[in-house]
């Protein structure tokens, strides 16, 4: 933890950042906001929110297909011989293995049918690294640590668990479990390999149990020794539970009691986000303590975590892109970070830090913001010929997922 802000959220989103394509969200309590009330009374006009593309529909589709092909190939090239998907690549030296980051890489790789085998190999790595109650420093079964891999000649020579102040480390339990469940559901759906899922049913149960164990009231806490309830984490938890619900109904239909628990938890976290995090001033609280105390003062001018966390409501599926509230949140975000000014123009990849923030373009793609997404993607494609720092696997994964969303939307328009 860094100064009270989740490293995963800060680094994950930024180094890249949740809500994986393929994790569908079915909860809908109203036609406008998927169960979220207190929306602004006057919705902003569409012209105030979305920008038109400069390229033709066909040119946009071509651009996004190139990005999907290029990013999936690069992400696949990162994979180590033991199946791990490191944040970056080096033939020799030390590489960070962050399972949460790796999940976004895997989700992106599943946009191509070329890499099903490699995603399966990554899932094998993840399953083999699940902690037991004895090996987890919080005594919780089904979690997974961050690791460092030492490689030589492109081969893994050793893996060691990362530590923080002398303790073995994972940044969270809730998000790590949720995003991995998204990977498994998407792998099963895209590849059709239900047999692999069934073979690993016991371990999937463990991951699901770890996720459910993080609930305190209507929301999840980051991990047992860091009891903060983050908007971003809980959006990802909603996605993960929606994915788990679909996965279990497809591959483990006989586990009716567990399916019922998953469905109830999905509804609980959706309601909890609305009941406990929505502020009538027009935003969701970034984080609270289990007693309801606000843990981080909100300001739209604070790019991370305040402003970016609002977009997770869109990318997670908790808000429909056409809903009044999604449009208002997206407009407020762009009022602050699509200004045309340096360090506050995300579509020009000009932001307060040096990272690519794939989570932002992913939310923009879901909103159907053709103009801003096109601007971002053209710059990204030009900058990423060598996939050099500060690009990380999860950021590239998010960009790829955004491109895939745009291909689908533009194809439907045809």
Per-region residue spans from a language model:
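Hydrophobic core
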Residues: 12, 16-17
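Sec-dependent signal peptide cleavage junction
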Residues: 18-36
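Aromatic-rich carbohydrate-recognition surfaces in CAZymes
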Residues: 93-211, 231-234, 373, 377, ...
């Amino acid at each position: 933890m860094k100064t009270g802000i989740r490293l995963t959220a800060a680094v994950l989103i930024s180094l890249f950042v949740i809500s994986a394509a393929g994790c569908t969200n079915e909860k809908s309590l109203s036609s406008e906001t998927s169960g979220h009330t207190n929306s602004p009374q006057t919705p902003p006009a569409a012209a105030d929110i979305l920008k038109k593309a400069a390229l033709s529909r066909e040119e946009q589709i071509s651009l996004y297909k190139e990005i999907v092909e290029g990013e999936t190939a690069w992400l696949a090239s990162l994979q180590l011989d033991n199946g791990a998907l490191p944040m970056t690549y080096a033939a020799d030296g030390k590489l960070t293995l962050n399972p949460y980051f790796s999940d976004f890489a895997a989700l992106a790789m599943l946009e191509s049918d070329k890499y099903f085998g490699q995603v399966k190999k990554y899932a094998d790595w993840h399953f083999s690294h699940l902690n037991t109650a004895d090996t987890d420093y919080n005594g919780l079964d089904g979690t997974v640590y961050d690791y460092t891999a030492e490689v030589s000649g492109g081969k893994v020579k050793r893996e060691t668990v990362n530590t923080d102040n002398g303790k073995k480390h994972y940044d969270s339990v809730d998000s790590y479990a949720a995003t991995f469940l998204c990977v498994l559901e998407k792998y099963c759906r895209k590849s059709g390999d239900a047999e692999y899922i069934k073979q690993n049913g016991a371990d999937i149960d463990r991951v699901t149990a770890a996720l459910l164990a993080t609930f305190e009231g209507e929301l999840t806490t980051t991990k047992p020794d860091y009891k903060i309830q983050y908007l971003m984490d809980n959006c990802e938890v909603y996605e993960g539970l929606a994915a788990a619900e679909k996965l279990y109904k497809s591959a483990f239909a006989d586990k009716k009691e567990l399916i019922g628990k998953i469905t109830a938890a999905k509804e609980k976290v959706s309601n909890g986000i609305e009941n406990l995090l929505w502020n009538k001033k027009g935003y969701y609280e970034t984080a609270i303590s289990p007693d309801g105390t606000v843990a981080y003062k909100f300001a739209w001018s604070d790019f991370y975590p305040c402003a970016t966390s609002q977009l997770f409501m869109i990318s997670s599926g908790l808000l429909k892109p056409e809903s009044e509230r999604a449009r208002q949140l997206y407009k407020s975000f762009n009022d602050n970070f699509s200004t045309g000014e340096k360090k506050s123009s995300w579509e020009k990849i000009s932001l307060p830090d040096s990272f690519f923030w794939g989570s932002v373009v992913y939310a923009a793609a879901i909103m159907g913001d053709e103009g801003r997404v096109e601007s971002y993607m053209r710059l990204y494609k030009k900058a990423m010929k060598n996939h050099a720092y500060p690009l990380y696997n999860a950021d590239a994964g998010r960009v790829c997922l955004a491109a895939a969303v745009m291909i689908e939307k533009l194809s439907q328009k045809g």
